[in-house]
């Protein structure tokens, strides 16, 4: 390990995923000497070559710059001779197969810190956790060392795909186990962003992070529920949203769509499990999560009815466009992507279909590991397809000329758009290819009958 020996605090970041590596780059740029710890050898190797292992705007250039300057190095474990001032935990806290929050990686990271930290070290937890984890799990592990330390929960709240920019402009919430810990964490993050929000205790910081994400999940679920009402009454959800908020400041409904990703797909469960021993239950939040999780099956059942109307045979070709969990800002992240439950729901109703996938950033290997046939262009995805589904809102799908490419599809064919990227009345599709969008099922069916 070779770090540039200029003055500056040494920070060890445990976990070099989407959260850890972006933070590592920004901290290195702001004068910290950064050691990134990651158990995946491939990630360590790539990082030390200045090559990001995921897509993030500006990451390639900025990572290479701090690595070349000796400001950031990666390794598999905390070096024995480390003289670090700060330790930051950014490891994942995914759900297990049973649905419970996994804390094994968090505990392992904390134990590793405990073995290496010196007196008065600052430990910062940024991973999303159940309320109480900082005090009841992380703190006791560190206390066993009999060393003095500062501990704070400082949640990551950046938008994946735009994280490098948001790290330096978003307010940073800080909740320390005591005033000294909050002060120490503030001194660190003041070098990164200009706005610091110190809350009264750790629990407030923990629940604030969960509220940020679960409130968005609820908001999107409301939009999806209204879209289902529009589906059956013959309204256009896109028009409802636009009309409702035009010149009227008290209605701001988002568009409907698939809701997933590494945060929104699990944080409702983390919040629910946080209060499982109390009488109060997050009923609205959990009902909203179910609404969003039910979208794939709901749409698949509608498409099966549509297939019967169009008299499709069993051996149809179905292409999925947009496999990453979101398209804007662009990412190649498949964690929590709704493409997988959509794919599974479609297989239930079209078991003999051939399934292809296209994404601007997702690799051929990852596409094929999902069980899809890889296509390297939209043209190839549309060629001979009976059904094309737009799964995320990547700009490519908003701007590509569908009217010029639907001639490649089998007839009758359907383009189903989860994101309402096109104008229902002005798609100008090739004859025999029909457009359907979330929140306008009945309206689109009526338009199909008029063609």
What is the meaning of each model-derived region?
Residues 1-451:
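Structural/interface elements that position substrates and couple domains in central-metabolism enzymes
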């Amino acid at each position: 390990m070779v770090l540039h020996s200029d003055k500056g605090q040494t920070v060890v970041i445990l976990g070099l995923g989407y959260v850890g590596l972006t933070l590592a780059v920004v901290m290195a740029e702001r004068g910290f000497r950064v050691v990134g710890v990651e158990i995946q050898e491939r990630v360590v190797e790539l990082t030390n070559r200045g090559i990001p292992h995921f897509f993030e705007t500006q990451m390639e250039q900025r990572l290479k710059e701090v690595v070349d300057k000796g400001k950031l190095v990666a390794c598999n474990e905390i070096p024995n001779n480390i003289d670090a001032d700060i330790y930051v935990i950014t490891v994942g806290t995914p759900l297990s197969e049973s649905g419970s929050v996994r804390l094994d990686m968090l505990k392992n990271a904390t134990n590793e810190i405990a073995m290496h930290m010196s007196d008065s070290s600052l430990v910062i937890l940024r991973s999303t956790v159940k309320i109480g984890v900082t005090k009841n799990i992380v703190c006791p592990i560190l206390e066993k060392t009999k060393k003095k330390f500062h501990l704070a929960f400082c949640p990551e709240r950046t938008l994946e795909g735009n994280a490098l920019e948001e790290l330096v402009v978003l307010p940073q919430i800080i909740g320390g186990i005591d005033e000294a810990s909050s002060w120490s964490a503030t001194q660190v993050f003041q070098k990164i962003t200009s706005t610091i929000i110190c809350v009264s205790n750790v629990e407030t910081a923990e629940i604030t992070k969960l509220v940020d994400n679960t409130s968005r999940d609820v908001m999107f679920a409301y939009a999806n529920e209204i879209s289902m009402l529009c589906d059956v009454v013959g309204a256009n959800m896109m028009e409802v949203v636009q009309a409702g908020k035009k010149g009227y400041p008290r209605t701001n409904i988002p568009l409907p769509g698939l809701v997933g990703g590494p945060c929104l797909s699990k944080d409702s469960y983390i919040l629910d499990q946080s209060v499982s021993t109390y009488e109060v239950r997050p009923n609205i939040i959990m009902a909203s999560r179910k609404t969003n999780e039910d979208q794939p099956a709901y749409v698949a059942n509608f498409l099966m009815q549509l297939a019967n109307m169009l008299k499709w045979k069993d051996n149809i070709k179905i292409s999925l466009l947009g496999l990453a969990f979101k398209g804007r800002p662009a990412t190649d992240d498949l964690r929590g992507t709704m493409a997988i439950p959509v794919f599974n729901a479609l297989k239930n109703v079209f078991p003999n279909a051939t399934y292809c996938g296209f994404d601007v950033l997702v690799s051929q290997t990852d596409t094929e590991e999902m069980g899809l046939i890889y296509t390297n262009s939209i043209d190839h995805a549309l060629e001979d397809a009976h059904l094309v589904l737009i799964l995320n809102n990547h700009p490519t799908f908003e701007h590509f000329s569908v009217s010029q490419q639907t001639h490649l599809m089998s007839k009758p064919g359907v383009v189903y758009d989860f994101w309402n990227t096109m104008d229902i009345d002005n798609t100008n599709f090739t004859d025999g290819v029909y457009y359907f969008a979330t929140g306008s099922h009945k309206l689109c069916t009526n338009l199909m009958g008029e063609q």
